[in-house]
Amino acid sequence: MLTILKLGGSILSDKNVPYSIKWDNLERIAMEIKNALDYYKNQNKEIKLILVHGGGAFGHPVAKKYLKIEDGKKIFINMEKGFWEIQRAMRRFNNIIIDTLQSYDIPAVSIQPSSFVVFGDKLIFDTSAIKEMLKRNLVPVIHGDIVIDDKNGYRIISGDDIVPYLANELKADLILYATDVDGVLIDNKPIKRIDKNNIYKILNYLSGSNSIDVTGGMKYKIDMIRKNKCRGFVFNGNKANNIYKALLGEVEGTEIDFSE
């Protein structure tokens, strides 16, 4: 079984405090991932795991230094230095996460998109190395990054850009979105399940003026699970044991199921 776990929201860092780390959360999440991997091993069950995280308090403040608005569009400037500096900030964040995972004996390995991802008419992402890592029971840890855009020079790709691409290319069985809310919220309450019977009602609600999409991309998350015809959860990664439960497919939150 291939599972993709996206760590997002304010789980790992505070975007309002540059270069901050929520150490208690990071340590807890590493422990829960380790416990889940041990569970599968003890049950003689196979799990292949990919972790994805965003820029957090590291990538965002640096990227802002090299962005300006011109004719209503965001463009990058001074990228002879900026590309390296954004790349370095993301690598620094990723290294902290990798080091913590490794301290719990999780075979985590870093994947830096800027070295092999190109954006043109579509995202071009060579997944051959990731496939080989998964065959060897390694845990690839991939992050949002600055990449080459063959039309516009440069582009930031987020964790939410990476997850659906990998899910489609690698045929993921389970997509997990660890956010800072309790699931897909309707009237401030998490809906238990989204499937073919209520998907359009939910999407219409999230498009309406009464909806507050606190994660900034809840519709996108739901739609990616639907398009990839798999099962997923949107849940609160700040709550103890939720990462562990999610990896076992039983977390409290919103279950989204379009598996066939």
Curated annotation (Swiss-Prot):
Can the keyword ATP-binding be found in this entry's annotation? Answer: yes
Q: One cellular component GO annotation, for this chain's record?
A: cytosol
Name the GO terms of the biological process aspect: terpenoid biosynthetic process
Temperature dependence as stated in the record:
Retains 38% activity when incubated at 100 degrees Celsius for 10 minutes.
Q: Mind telling me which InterPro entries this protein's record contains?
A: AceGlu_kinase-like_sf, Asp/Glu/Uridylate_kinase, Fosfomycin_R_FomA-type, Glu/AcGlu_kinase
> According to the record, how does pH govern the activity?
Optimum pH is 7-9.
Per its UniProt record, what Gene3D superfamilies does this chain match?
Answer: Acetylglutamate kinase-like
Its keywords, alphabetically, are: ATP-binding, Isoprene biosynthesis, Kinase, Nucleotide-binding, Transferase
Q: Which reaction does it catalyse?
A: isopentenyl phosphate + ATP = isopentenyl diphosphate + ADP
Q: Provide the residue positions that the database annotates as binding ATP.
A: K6, L7, G8, G9, S10, G56, D180, G217, K221
Marked site positions, Transition state stabilizer: K15
- List residues binding substrate: G55, H60, G159
E.C. number: 2.7.4.26
Q: Name one GO molecular function term.
A: ATP binding
Annotated PANTHER family: GLUTAMATE 5-KINASE (PTHR43654), ISOPENTENYL PHOSPHATE KINASE (PTHR43654:SF1)
Entries under NCBIfam families matching the protein: IPPK_Arch (NF040647)
What is this protein's function? Catalyzes the formation of isopentenyl diphosphate (IPP), the building block of all isoprenoids. Has no activity with farnesyl phosphate.
**Entry protein name:** Isopentenyl phosphate kinase
Species for this entry: Methanocaldococcus jannaschii (strain ATCC 43067 / DSM 2661 / JAL-1 / JCM 10045 / NBRC 100440) (Methanococcus jannaschii)
